[in-house]
């Protein structure tokens, strides 16, 4: 009798667990991404490879900055933010946001994120202190703000003496063109191209690299989605790294990526060429003891913000 009861109870528990797993599986996956920020997995996005691997629809929504991605995740509208800037993520977890960093989208120099001064202003690296007292456009709470702060250290200008105006990249580029600001810090190939049509980079890509200014974009996820759908999250990251490997092998469809990024092919190739897409092993090293770990420590990021267990190692 005890054996029968034990079998029945065991069966009930097993059934309950299987139902729980089934019920927790998401009916769709909602992903945030950026336009003008080309990445290999956009080919998979367009060709439905994520849907095939996950078995559910994937809804992609473009955002203007990483802070907006965080807001959407906290509102319950986004599950995964792909290529979110590290700075907005750090700001979020410092405020105890229930988010986790689970992958590195890419590392990059200042080709894709930079500060541009207008030619009309006559301001360059050599006389950068003249930015003080002037209006500058910066998308606050993003990697571009980090680049702004680090660039000001290099040229010896005091941020507190500038009129810093919150503007997303497209707005900042337009303000630079119209003369409303003397400098715009921005990201995204189209916005940078518009800005450099009337201005010049305050620091060249090489000067920024020499100064140790490195950008890192990450993949973040809500704690809720991670706990309820660990298999889906792991699959999403696997597909992403497969796309990166295809790109490294020179087998990506660049025309598809350019079209999805809403960029001209030449501009897209120039932008993506400045990105470094890490292998899973390189990603783990960066997250535990490399560039990412150093960045997190330097910005006093709370412990427990990173989870490497979903990497396809």
Predicted regions mapped to residue ranges:
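Bacterial N-terminal signal peptides that target proteins for export
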Residues: 1-9
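Hinge/cleft segment of the Venus flytrap/periplasmic-binding protein
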Residues: 295-313
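C-terminal segment of classical bacterial N-terminal signal peptides
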Residues: 14-23
């Amino acid at each position: 009798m005890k054996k029968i009861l034990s079998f029945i109870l065991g069966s009930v528990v097993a059934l309950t667990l299987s139902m729980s797993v089934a019920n927790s599986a998401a009916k769709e996956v909602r992903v945030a991404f950026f336009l003008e920020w080309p990445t290999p997995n956009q080919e998979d996005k367009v060709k439905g490879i994520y849907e095939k691997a996950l078995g559910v629809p994937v809804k992609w929504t473009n955002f203007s900055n990483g802070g907006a991605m965080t807001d959407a995740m906290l509102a319950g509208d986004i599950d995964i933010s792909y290529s979110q800037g590290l700075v907005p993520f750090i700001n979020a977890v410092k405020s105890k946001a229930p988010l986790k960093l689970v992958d590195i989208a890419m590392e990059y120099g200042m080709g894709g994120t930079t500060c541009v001064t207008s030619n009309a202003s006559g301001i360059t690296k050599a006389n950068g202190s003249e930015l003080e007292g002037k209006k500058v456009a910066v998308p606050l709470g993003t990697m571009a703000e980090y680049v702004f702060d680090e660039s000001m250290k290099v040229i010896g200008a005091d941020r507190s003496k500038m009129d810093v105006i919150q503007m997303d990249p497209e707005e900042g580029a337009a303000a630079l063109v119209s003369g409303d600001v003397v400098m715009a810090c921005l990201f995204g190939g189209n916005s940078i191209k518009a800005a450099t049509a009337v201005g010049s980079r305050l620091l060249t890509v090489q000067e920024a690299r020499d100064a140790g200014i490195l950008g890192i974009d990450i993949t973040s996820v809500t704690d809720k989605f991670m706990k309820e759908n660990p298999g889906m999250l792991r699959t999403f990251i696997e597909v992403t790294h497969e796309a990166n490997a295809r790109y490294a092998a020179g087998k990506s469809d660049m025309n598809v990526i350019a079209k999805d990024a809403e960029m001209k092919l030449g501009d897209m190739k120039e932008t993506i060429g400045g990105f470094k897409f890490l292998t899973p092993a390189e990603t783990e090293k960066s997250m535990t003891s490399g560039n990412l770990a150093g960045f997190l420590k330097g910005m006093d990021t709370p412990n427990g913000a990173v989870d490497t267990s979903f990497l396809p190692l």
